[in-house]
């Protein structure tokens, strides 16, 4: 009986999966708040991710992304392109059984955004000089969405998701207005096995 319990426990731990991979997607962004004559602007998302999933269905995804946000302005005659390094930290729940070929999922978590550039449609800098910045260097957001993981072959998964990100902070340093980021994202990634995480020892056993 004791051996059976130990065997089942070891088997469950062995099935807890850690994977990494690249991600690419489309960002569709706009502003909300004290703004007028803005419209949705497409942009690029590219980066990588770290996934952890367990038999219970709960998991975690940490991502490091380059994402283009902003908006079209002046009746679509110009653009504000805000380029961010993003770090979404997403609690994930997978539906279905562990090992199923298709695993639908939902996720929610904070998004740390670090501004690396602000340019107009022609590529001109619109963020002022180092002593007079127009846009804030950091934005905190909330990201939630859903999607599915599809197993292409043993332990190699196609990751697909649709997400919505809402900015929580004013992205400008202007005193007379408050503007926040607002964006949809459609992303595709490919995950490869990294190893097995043992929740009792807190160690990652790589392949």
Model segments located where?
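Extracellular/periplasm-exposed beta-strand and loop segments of Gram-negative cell-envelope proteins
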Residues: 31-39, 69-83, 114-139, 172-179
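Transmembrane beta-strands of outer-membrane beta-barrel proteins
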Residues: 18-24, 60-62, 87, 104-110, ...
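Outer-membrane beta-barrel "beta-signal"
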Residues: 23, 88-92, 182-207
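Short glycine/proline- and aromatic-enriched beta-strand/turn motifs that initiate or cap beta-hairpins
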Residues: 13-51, 191-193, 205-207
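Transmembrane beta-barrel domains of outer membrane proteins
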Residues: 49-51, 90-94, 139, 147-149, ...
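Residues that define the transmembrane beta-barrel architecture of outer-membrane proteins
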Residues: 16-18, 38-44, 81-87, 102, ...
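Gram-negative (and chloroplast) outer-membrane scaffold detector with strong preference
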Residues: 52-124, 192
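Short loop/turn motifs that connect adjacent beta-strands in outer-membrane beta-barrel proteins
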Residues: 12-18, 56-57, 96-103, 152-156, ...
């Amino acid at each position: 009986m004791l051996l059976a319990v130990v065997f089942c426990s070891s088997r469950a731990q062995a099935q807890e999966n850690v994977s990494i991979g690249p991600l690419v997607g489309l960002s569709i962004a706009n502003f909300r708040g004290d703004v007028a004559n803005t419209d949705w602007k497409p942009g690029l998302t590219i980066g990588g991710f770290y996934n952890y999933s367990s038999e219970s269905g709960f998991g975690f995804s940490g991502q490091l992304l380059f994402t283009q946000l902003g908006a079209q302005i002046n009746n679509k005659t110009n653009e504000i392109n805000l380029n961010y390094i993003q770090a979404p930290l997403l609690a994930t729940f997978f539906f279905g059984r562990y090992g199923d070929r298709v695993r639908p999922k939902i996720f929610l978590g904070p998004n740390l955004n670090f501004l690396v550039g602000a340019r107009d449609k022609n590529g001109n800098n619109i963020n002022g000089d180092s002593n007079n910045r127009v846009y804030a260097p950091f934005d905190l957001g909330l990201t939630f969405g859903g999607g599915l993981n599809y197993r292409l072959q043993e332990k190699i998964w196609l990751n697909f998701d649709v997400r919505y990100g809402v900015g929580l902070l004013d992205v400008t340093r202007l005193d007379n207005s408050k503007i926040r980021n607002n964006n949809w994202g459609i992303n595709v990634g490919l995950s490869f096995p990294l190893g097995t995480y043992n929740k009792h020892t807190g160690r990652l056993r790589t392949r």
